[in-house]
């Protein structure tokens, strides 16, 4: 299915990525390799990445399973508070992909683009910028719902 999605995006002239964890996860996985289809200039190229390619540890899916909204919020806040581990690595790696897709150099390979994105994702979390933005969104949401 991810190839069909990539073909549609290429036909529409979009640039970006479609990921599928080789363990069946619908995002970048820490549990082994991830198949990546890179779409650019109406062409599709295929690659595989592994968390280890970016200095991150592999981890089983069970290590990153969330829960209900409250549990997922708790996990997010703990990551933003500096907690290390598989959930943080999964968030950083998927954020790196989003950054690479949005701002990456189309001439560079996937690993180069994602490495640059990972540096920015780590900075956003470790500097407190991600937490600050989350707090702004929360305040805005509360303001809107109170109106």
Predicted regions and their residues:
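Glycine-rich anion-binding loops and their surrounding alpha/beta cores
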Residues: 1-147
């Amino acid at each position: 299915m991810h190839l069909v999605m990539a073909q549609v995006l290429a036909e529409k002239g979009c640039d970006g990525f479609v990921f599928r964890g080789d363990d069946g996860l619908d995002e970048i996985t820490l549990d082994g390799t991830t198949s990546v289809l890179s779409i650019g200039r109406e062409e599709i190229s295929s690659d595989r990445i592994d968390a280890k390619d970016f200095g991150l540890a592999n981890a089983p899916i069970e290590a990153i399973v969330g829960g209900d909204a409250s549990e997922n919020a708790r996990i997010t806040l703990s990551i933003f508070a500096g907690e290390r581990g598989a959930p943080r690595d999964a968030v950083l790696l998927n954020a790196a992909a989003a950054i690479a897709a949005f701002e990456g150099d189309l001439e560079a390979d996937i690993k180069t683009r994602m490495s640059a994105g990972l540096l920015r994702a780590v900075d956003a979390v470790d500097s407190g910028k991600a937490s600050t933005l989350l707090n702004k969104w929360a305040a805005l949401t509360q303001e809107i719902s109170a109106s």
